[in-house]
Each structure stands twice: as structure tokens, then as C-alpha cells.
Amino acid sequence: MAPPIYVRGGLWTNIEDQILKAAVQKYGVHQWSKIASLLQKKNARQCEIRWNEYLNPTLNFEEFTKEEDKKLLELVRTLPNQWRTISELMGRPSQQCIERYNILLETELSKTDGEATTSANSAISTSFGFKPNEIHPSAETQKAKPDNDELDEDEREMLSEARARLLNTQGKKATRKVRERMLEESKRIAQIQKRRELKQAGINTSLKKSKKKYENEIDYNADVVYEIVPPAVLYDVTRENERTQKALQDFERNIAKKGKRKFKDDGEKESSPRKRSRDKRPNKEDNKETSMSITSNDSVLLNDMKKPVLNLSAPRADGENLSVSSNNTNDAVLVKKYLTECFSALPTPKNDFEILWEDSDDDDEQEIVSEEDDNSIKVQESEQLYELPMETFDIVDSSMIPSIIADPKNEFEEEYNKLIKDARTRAKPTISKEHLQIWDDLNEEIQKDISGRTSLTNPEVQISTDTNLDELRAQIQKYQQRISNYDEQLHIIKPLVENNEQICNTIIRSLIPELKSKQLKYYTRYYMFMKEQKHIKKRTK
């Protein structure tokens, strides 16, 4: 015959609710398997749901308001089938939110169909189609069944076992457990005190480790709690660890020999010589006491703490013979006499020297005159070239010229606009009236001079002037040709310069930093490789 199948579940009884409350009060809300062992017909998951959905005193079981209904419908629309999240936002159990949502749906459907609205109880009953003997899927959120007049044998046995286990918090057994716990604590404190006394005597002992109640229990008597060992790094620090370990052992040995306070005082004396010298200085009270007992032949006068005696040389003249000089003239005579004696003691001069005259400045003067003549000739030629007509060359790009100010507000902006217009039209800048008057006067004088010269009938003069003008025109054409050649060369060189500048910028800004970073990575990896090879050789040996 097959064994019977026991299904854990169904509606909760009043006795089961009382046992669950008492178990949560003792074991807390994390040990549900231990709590479920007290209940024969329920498992750990069902106990947890029953507590979180129904028995928890912090839950809100009041009726829903209109604002809460509106909020519930909005949350269901935004978070479909996420009842845990909706219950947290509403501050109510998830099953209560589901039931309220079903009620709202049924009322809306009944209104659309034209049926009469039913009450809340009938809505709840009709929302689930269950038969009386079937197991309720949300039994943990339903009300508990009332107790019968007489309990069954299973319930009576379950209640007696729960009483035996849960009533340890009161009575003789509870006091005995508290007494045992206090005894263990006093034993532990006595062991720690004994260990401290033995350590001061130079005997190192270790405490007996108590049995752990659970696997991850922390022993706070250990040296380091929650110690995190640093990971192995690129550099070898074994020698540094050995040095620190040795220094720690020396420190502990000195503490064990001399004690902490004495060792601290010795360290302070060794580390602070200034404090040592300050300690050696006598206090004011000591000075008063010693000054009363000092005599003329006392050894305290020759004490090392005193400053050494100042030994001065004997004076050259007595203080009685010294007097302030009244006549400054006698002092000047004495100084003069002293200087003559010093000069007479010097050796006689040999006079072995020759006077070298500097070169004459005639050549320099001639060079200066020739430079002045050349400058005057250049000035005259430039003036003549300025008067002659010339072809204009657009060396400067028109895009480089700035724009004109639309509404000039002061004299500076008006002058600025004039200069820009002159630059665009390649016209000469405007000259003031005073300068124009001077220019007209000079021009009239030059015209008179030229007319006087042309009135002469000497053919040689006319030929010479004609030849000079031809030469000047030839030179002007030659310079114009050279300027045009330079302009063409500039147009060729300018893109090359820009390209070169762009290449230099890319090299400096991107390539050189990238090269440095790659070089650094290479050196670090090469260093790591060498270290690994070295350790591999050591291990193989």
C-alpha cells in the first residue's frame, strides 16, 4: 500500500497564528525553518508569507480611500503584474492590493453590463471560483479559522511541543541559561587577565578558542579583525617585511623588559636632545636655594653649566692717558705724514714703456662722408621714383583687410574707416591742408627751376636729362619684374609653409606623447619580463 501524501497548506488556524507570533518573538524574522518546525502543516515559506502579509503589526488593513484606488489603478497601468513593487509603493500587502484591484474591475464590469453592484464580500467570494474542500492558493492572507470545542490529537501534540520549546524565555530554564552565559563571560575575562599578567612576566600564552556558534563568527580577541591581505605587486618587499618584523620584535622585547612607560621615557630622552638640555637647566627655586649656599671658594663657580671665562688681551694703553683729540688739523697732518712715508717705501720706477699713438680718424671720416653721400643719392632716387607712374601689385590679399565700421561714433573710428578705404582702393592716404600748401609751394619752385633749365639752348643738357630718364625707366621696369617674381615665389612657398606647420603640429601634439606612452609601457613590461625570468631561474634551481 502506498504511503499517504501529506500536503502542507490550507487555511491557518488560530492556534497556528499564536504559535507563529511566539516563535517570531523568540527566533526573529530570519530563522523561518526553525519556526516552521513548530508547525506540522506549514513550511518555512508559508510562515514567512503569513507573517509578512497578515500578522505583521506594521501592516495597514484599513479600507481603501478614493485617492488610494486612483493611485492603485495608475500603478497597475504603469507596472503590470509587479505586485511586490506596487505593495511597497502603496504601503499595503500585495494580496490586499490584488483583491482590491479585482473588486474595482468587477464593479466596473457590472456597471457596463447593467447589473446591480454587489457588496465587497460577495465581490471577494466571486473573484475566486473555489470549492469548499479545495486548498486556497492565498490562504496566508485570509482570516484564521476559529478553534473547535475540542482540539485534535495532532493539534494538542503540536501545542505541547511548542510550549516546551518557546517557554524557555521564562522560568527556571531561562534563569539557568542566563547564569551559564554570565559564567562563561566571567571565565573569559579571568583568562584575559591571567594572560596579561603572564605576558608581563615574559610568558606568552594563548587563549582557548571557544566553540563557534556559527561558521562566520568573528573572534574579537584576534590581532586583526577583518584583515585584508594586500595583493602581490610588481616589486619584491620581502626584505622590508623582514625589517619591520624585526623592529616589532625588538619593540615587544623592550616593552617586556622595561615596561611601556619607562621605554617611552627612554625613547623621548634619546630622540629629543633639546629636551635633555632643558632638563639639565636648573629651576628658579633651585637657583634660590643654591645661591644661599655659594661661597667664594665654592666649586659651583666652576660648574660645567656656566659659560667659560672670557679671556681678553691686556690693554695697550692705560685708561688714564687716553683723551679725546681737540684739533682735527693735527690728525690730518699725521695722516699726510704717514702717507708720504708709505710712498717713500715704494721701489723706484723703471720707466720701461712706450707711448703708442692711435691711428688717425681720416679714414673713418671719409667713410662717414661717403655713407652720407650714398644716403642722399638714395633719397633723391626714391623721390623721383615716387613721382613716376607705376603698376600696382596685389601682394596683400583683400580678405586680410578688416571690415569698415558701420556707424562711427568718434574721431578714431572715422580715421580707421579712412585708412581701410585707402587700403582697399590702393590710394594714397589723405593729407591735411597745411601739408598740401607746403607741397604746392615746393612744386611751384621745382617747376620754375625746370622751366629755367629747359629755356637753355644747350643740347648737351637736354641729352643728359633724356638719358637719365631712360635709365630710370629701365631700372623701374627691372624692379617691377623682380617684384612680380617674388610674388610668384610667395604664392608657391605659402602652401608649403602651411603644410609644414600642420605636420609639425601633428608630430608634437599627437605622435610624440603617443610614442612616450608606448615607450613607458614597453619599459614596464620589459622590467616585468626580466623579473619573471629571474624568479623562474631561482625556482628551477
From Swiss-Prot:
Disulphide bridges: none
Molecular-function GO term, any one: DNA binding
Keyword Ribonucleoprotein: no
Major location (coarse): cytoplasm
Keyword Nucleus appears in the UniProt entry: yes
Chain positions covered by the region annotation Disordered: 115-152, 250-299
Signal peptide: none
Compositional bias segments (type: Low complexity): 116-127
Alphabetized UniProt keyword annotations: Coiled coil, Cytoplasm, DNA-binding, mRNA processing, mRNA splicing, Nucleus, Repeat, Spliceosome
Compositional bias of kind Polar residues: 290-299
Biased composition annotated in UniProt, kind: Basic and acidic residues: 263-273, 280-289
InterPro entries, alphabetized: CDC5L/Cef1, Homeodomain-like_sf, Myb_dom, SANT/Myb, SANT_CDC5L_II
GO biological process, one term: generation of catalytic spliceosome for second transesterification step
SMART domains referenced in this protein's UniProt entry, alphabetically: SANT
Family named by the database record: Belongs to the CEF1 family.
PANTHER family attached to this UniProt entry: CELL DIVISION CYCLE 5-LIKE PROTEIN (PTHR45885:SF1)
Self-association and partners: Associated with the spliceosome.
Descriptive protein name: Pre-mRNA-splicing factor CEF1
Name of the gene: CEF1
